[in-house]
Amino acid sequence: MKTKFYDYQGEHLILYFAGWGTPPDAVNHLILPENHDLLICYDYQDLNLDFDLSAYRHIRLVAWSMGVWVAERVLQGIRLKSATAVNGTGLPCDDSFGIPYAIFKGTLENLTENTRLKFERRICGDKASFERYQLFPARPFDEIHQELTALFAMIQQDKRIDLIHWANAWVSSRDKIFTPANQHQYWALRCAVQEIEGEHYVFSRFTHWSALWDH
C-alpha cells in the first residue's frame, strides 16, 4: 500500500484508511486535533504498511469503505485509542453485510474510465458534490484497476472478522455502495452506530477529525 504522512511532530497519530480508488486529498479539509500527526493509507495492491507506529502515545483509526477490511488486517495487535468505521464493514463483498458479490464482481469486470466516473458520481450522490470531488487529483486508472483486482482476490481468500475492536461506525442514510441496511446488520451487535444524512462519500459533512469519534 501507499502512504501519505503529515508530520507535525505530534505525540499522537490519526491513521486514515481510504476507500478503494479514492484520492488521499478527499479528507484534506478535516482539521487535525492539537499534537497529532496524520498518516493516510491507500492503494491496497498489497497490505504491507511500512511505518513505525511505536513512537506514538495514542493512535486513532478512521477507516472508510474498503479501508475497514484492510485496517482489520493491518492493525491486528496494535493498541488503538479508538477505531471508527465510515460506510464500510468487515465483510465488504457479501450479499447481507457488504456489497453484493455480483455487484462487486461486475464493478471489477466492467471497469473503464467511464464506469469509474459513474462510480464516483454514485459515491457523491448529487452533481454539485460530484463536481467538487472531481477537483481532487485523480489516481491513475491502471493503479485503481490493479487495486480492485488485488482486493477482490484477497477478500475471497480471507473472510475473517472482528480482528480489531471498533468503537463506533457511521452509516450514511443514502449510501449507494454499502447499503444502510447491510451496514446496520453488520454493526448492530458490534459497536455504537450513528446514522448520518449523506452519501457514501460523507467527509464533506465534517470539518474536524475529532467529530468522527466525539459525538
From Swiss-Prot:
Highest rank taxon of the organism: Bacteria
Pfam families linked: BioG
Name of the protein in its database record: Uncharacterized protein HI_1552
